[in-house]
Amino acid sequence: MEKIFLNGEFVSPSEAKVSYNDRGYVFGDGIYEYIRVYNGKLFTVTEHYERFLRSANEIGLDLNYSVEELIELSRKLVDMNQIETGAIYIQATRGVAERNHSFPTPEVEPAIVAYTKSYDRPYDHLENGVNGVTVEDIRWLRCDIKSLNLLGNVLAKEYAVKYNAVEAIQHRGETVTEGSSSNAYAIKDGVIYTHPINNYILNGITRIVIKKIAEDYNIPFKEETFTVDFLRNADEVIVSSTSAEVTPVIKLDGEPVNDGKVGPITRQLQEGFEKYIESHSI
């Protein structure tokens, strides 16, 4: 029987209930992580939970969990649910309290829930590429925190769906930031460009992996801003995330990227990613 982790216990889905006064439900006052499972093993799990605890610290949320403890509960959940290929979603909120914008006084216990999902890798997208669109980035100014406040992302993703695209690549003015659920890259003249790490983007775990792969393959990797026009005229465009892995974008705003085919640097990064899965899953 499927199990859900809820506030220190492994329970059935029917028992996994939260209060209507949970601050995650009322305010989006919480954080989350999404961790890939390959061959029954957790991929880059340490990096994910280090970011999880950083996000918690940034919003003043003390979870009383170490990285090691979070990894252990994740392993148990994956084993219980017999997940071979899929993911684990975990979120923490500031807990249950009467509705008030300020933090609860006295403090209440955080609410933590985690569940698993079995699903295959996006082979078709990886092999053939996807359509993308560009859209104005209307999100808040702390995108480096992986918070539950995702309305801006949701609206951007829905815009992509409306125009038969898989991802919306966002921009503030003319400066490209990131995708609605991914980091974004423009490849030009053999160089990978992506937005620098700051409060405008999430420091994606797959982004970190791609940077390391680029170093291994001696591909120049520049963390600097670029424009929407630069993106549209790139030789290759990719988006990356835990679920999307290294996905090529072959059409942007209805026009082909370069010749509309998956490019050679994208293929190198995908090759390196396969090796990284083997070496960084535990």
UniProtKB/Swiss-Prot annotation:
<dbReference type="GO" id="GO:0047810">
    <property type="term" value="F:D-alanine-2-oxoglutarate aminotransferase activity"/>
</dbReference>
<dbReference type="InterPro" id="IPR036038">
    <property type="entry name" value="Aminotransferase-like"/>
</dbReference>
<keyword id="KW-0032">Aminotransferase</keyword>
<comment type="subunit">
    <text>Homodimer.</text>
</comment>
<dbReference type="InterPro" id="IPR018300">
    <property type="entry name" value="Aminotrans_IV_CS"/>
</dbReference>
<dbReference type="GO" id="GO:0005829">
    <property type="term" value="C:cytosol"/>
</dbReference>
<feature type="binding site">
    <location>
        <position position="101"/>
    </location>
    <ligand>
        <name>substrate</name>
    </ligand>
</feature>
<dbReference type="InterPro" id="IPR005784">
    <property type="entry name" value="D_amino_transT"/>
</dbReference>
<dbReference type="GO" id="GO:0046437">
    <property type="term" value="P:D-amino acid biosynthetic process"/>
</dbReference>
<feature type="binding site">
    <location>
        <position position="99"/>
    </location>
    <ligand>
        <name>substrate</name>
    </ligand>
</feature>
<dbReference type="InterPro" id="IPR043131">
    <property type="entry name" value="BCAT-like_N"/>
</dbReference>
<dbReference type="Pfam" id="PF01063">
    <property type="entry name" value="Aminotran_4"/>
</dbReference>
<dbReference type="InterPro" id="IPR001544">
    <property type="entry name" value="Aminotrans_IV"/>
</dbReference>
<dbReference type="GO" id="GO:0030170">
    <property type="term" value="F:pyridoxal phosphate binding"/>
</dbReference>
<dbReference type="InterPro" id="IPR050571">
    <property type="entry name" value="Class-IV_PLP-Dep_Aminotrnsfr"/>
</dbReference>
<keyword id="KW-0808">Transferase</keyword>
<comment type="similarity">
    <text>Belongs to the class-IV pyridoxal-phosphate-dependent aminotransferase family.</text>
</comment>
<dbReference type="InterPro" id="IPR043132">
    <property type="entry name" value="BCAT-like_C"/>
</dbReference>
<feature type="binding site">
    <location>
        <position position="178"/>
    </location>
    <ligand>
        <name>pyridoxal 5'-phosphate</name>
    </ligand>
</feature>
<feature type="active site" description="Proton acceptor">
    <location>
        <position position="146"/>
    </location>
</feature>
<dbReference type="GO" id="GO:0019478">
    <property type="term" value="P:D-amino acid catabolic process"/>
</dbReference>
<feature type="binding site">
    <location>
        <position position="51"/>
    </location>
    <ligand>
        <name>pyridoxal 5'-phosphate</name>
    </ligand>
</feature>
<feature type="binding site">
    <location>
        <position position="32"/>
    </location>
    <ligand>
        <name>substrate</name>
    </ligand>
</feature>
<feature type="modified residue" description="N6-(pyridoxal phosphate)lysine">
    <location>
        <position position="146"/>
    </location>
</feature>
<comment type="function">
    <text>Acts on the D-isomers of alanine, leucine, aspartate, glutamate, aminobutyrate, norvaline and asparagine. The enzyme transfers an amino group from a substrate D-amino acid to the pyridoxal phosphate cofactor to form pyridoxamine and an alpha-keto acid in the first half-reaction. The second half-reaction is the reverse of the first, transferring the amino group from the pyridoxamine to a second alpha-keto acid to form the product D-amino acid via a ping-pong mechanism. This is an important process in the formation of D-alanine and D-glutamate, which are essential bacterial cell wall components.</text>
</comment>
<protein>
    <recommendedName>
        <fullName>D-alanine aminotransferase</fullName>
        <ecNumber>2.6.1.21</ecNumber>
    </recommendedName>
</protein>
<keyword id="KW-0663">Pyridoxal phosphate</keyword>
